[in-house]
UniProtKB/Swiss-Prot annotation:
Principal subcellular localisation of the protein: mitochondrion
A single GO cellular-component term on record: mitochondrial inner membrane
The keyword Transmembrane is assigned to this record: yes
Places the protein is found: Mitochondrion inner membrane
Protein name: Surfeit locus protein 1
Family indicated by similarity: Belongs to the SURF1 family.
Source species of the chain: Takifugu rubripes (Japanese pufferfish)
GO biological process: mitochondrial cytochrome c oxidase assembly
Transmembrane segments: 2-20, 215-235
Length: 240
């Protein structure tokens, strides 16, 4: 009957959607892998052209200059990334359960003559105040290698940034630059830029929304359920 073959479209469609999600998941995993490889590629000199920077997120760059520790910003709460595992685990958090903050410091790039923002890395809660980690407040010109990051928009359930208290919950470059006077250029310093007593670098998380496995289970589950219902109703009742 028409109804019999019409209802067969339901398991056929859900099977097709499940298969499509399998392909989408593979594409997303390859994209994450590609971005992760950028974070370990040979660094290039930091470009100053905003148009060029906008296409370089997660690209490793290098620059020489000096930190201005008097204008530190704090993104919190943050858990530490395990630098040794980050490249292959695409952003998985460390299992220590410890929380603290990422220290964002203006950095004057000598050869470009501009000041940018550098995420020096993670400090535990008890070390957020700079006077508790004076050994790590390095002075003088140095080379920093890191990863270009772009501005963020506030995600659902993430609090608004509290500029007055210097509590930042997401990377709002426009607001951060208004406070510090820096250019809207942001770099996550890598683990090799860590200095004794200072923040732990290498806090870049390669994060892309990847919920395809949930959709795969959902669509294939619906396919199995509706296939069984169709078989029970239309096939078991006739002689094969």
């Amino acid at each position: 009957s028409f109804l019999k073959w019409f209802l067969l479209l339901i398991p056929a469609t859900t099977f097709g959607l499940g298969t499509w999600q399998v392909k989408r998941r593979q594409w997303k995993m390859e994209l994450i892998d590609g971005l992760t490889k950028l974070t370990t590629a040979e660094p290039i000199p930091l470009p100053i052209d905003p148009a060029e920077l906008s296409s370089l997120e997660y690209r490793r760059v290098k620059m020489r200059g000096k930190y201005d520790h008097s204008k530190e910003l704090y993104i919190l709460p943050r858990s530490p990334v395990d630098p040794e595992k980050e490249a292959r685990e695409a952003g998985r958090l460390s299992s220590s359960g410890e929380t603290g903050a990422n220290v964002i410091t203006p950095f004057h790039v000598t050869d470009l003559g501009i000041t940018i923002l550098v995420n020096r890395g993670y400090v535990p809660k008890k070390k957020i105040r700079p006077e508790t980690r004076m050994k790590g407040q390095v002075e003088g010109e140095m080379e920093v290698v890191g990863v270009v990051r772009l501005t963020e928009t506030r995600k659902p359930f993430v609090p608004n940034n509290d500029v007055e208290r210097n509590h930042w919950h997401y990377r709002d470059l426009e607001a951060m630059c208004q406070v510090t006077g820096a250019e809207p250029i942001f770099v996550d310093a890598d683990f090799s830029s860590t200095v004794p007593g200072g923040p732990i670098g290498g806090q870049t998380r390669v994060t892309l929304r990847n919920e395809h496995m949930q959709y795969i289970v959902t669509w294939y589950g619906l396919c199995a359920a509706t296939s069984y219902m169709w078989f029970a109703k239309f096939i078991k009742k006739i002689k094969v």
